[in-house]
Amino acid sequence: MIEHLGINTPYFGILVSLIPFVIATYFYKKTNGFFLLAPLFVSMVAGIAFLKLTGISYENYKIGGDIINFFLEPATICFAIPLYRKREVLKRYWLQIFGGIAVGTIIALLLIYLVAITFQFGNQIIASMLPQAATTAIALPVSDGIGGVKELTSLAVILNAVVISALGAKIVKLFKISNPIARGLALGTSGHTLGVAAAKELGETEESMGSIAVVIVGVIVVAVVPILAPILL
């Protein structure tokens, strides 16, 4: 019966990812962004549950899943659009922007490591967690290169983004951060794509700065994590 569902075709993996994503997006908007209905989070949980309940192997899903994964990298390039729109702001405050993002990213990496050793995680788990500050498209190859588990890295990236999506804007308001540049950088640095989505709700400048942060954080993770990993692990 299951064989007739086309599980050996790319369409299967794509639909298993796309259907819950579309449904979750609808309800996420209807509930004004209730964090447990974040589309990425729901898609991940629904996909795992479906494969587990049906007994279909991950390899069958991966045929279509790899196609989605392929488009992650070119999709990341789209962050250059809002960056271009706010290029004058970038030119004017480039030192503060790059400095703030760099400090925030390094602190995030060190905090991840401290939490990991506090709970006595193994080196493979630590290696999987270190790249989570970047988007999935960047974090996965970095994780693979330092001996991490890509699936665990993907989970860490998504959970991190969901938390920032849910609480990021509230934290910004709690600390009374009124500068749109600072707000956008904070959300983009800590929550990557979903952080940018949260920044977009605050304003165009916040969205642009969040997009800039995502790009720069990715560059820092690619450059720094492979150097830090042999030292920390």
UniProtKB/Swiss-Prot annotation:
Annotated signal peptide: none
S-S pairs: none
Subcellular location per the Swiss-Prot or TrEMBL entry: Cell membrane
Superkingdom assignment: Bacteria
Pfam families: LrgB
Classification via HAMAP family: LrgB
Name of the protein: Antiholin-like protein LrgB
Highest classification ranks of the organism: Bacteria, Bacillati, Bacillota, Bacilli, Bacillales
Primary gene name: lrgB
